């Protein structure tokens, strides 16, 4: 998809390199809720917190995305997630509509009836 649209996807183990010139910065939590073996996890992600210093290397019009819930102060700072560049609330709302549409499709179409016949 990226090559057909003229886009590119880039990953890096260097946080500054990863965001340099980026139009979108997308992160997730470093440690899942209820995860027991967290020793060393924060060390492994050192330098990857999305903060004002890091996003200064991105495109000035960058968008910040996070699948939520965010652990403020861990993977992202308040300044970034609450900034005008953050689209996390729109992202969450769009996810809700997509999930509702999928449920509607499954409940009102042959996909649901086919599943019920398999039981």
Task: Give, region by region, the residue ranges found by the protein language model.
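Structural/interface elements that position substrates and couple domains in central-metabolism enzymes
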Residues: 1-119
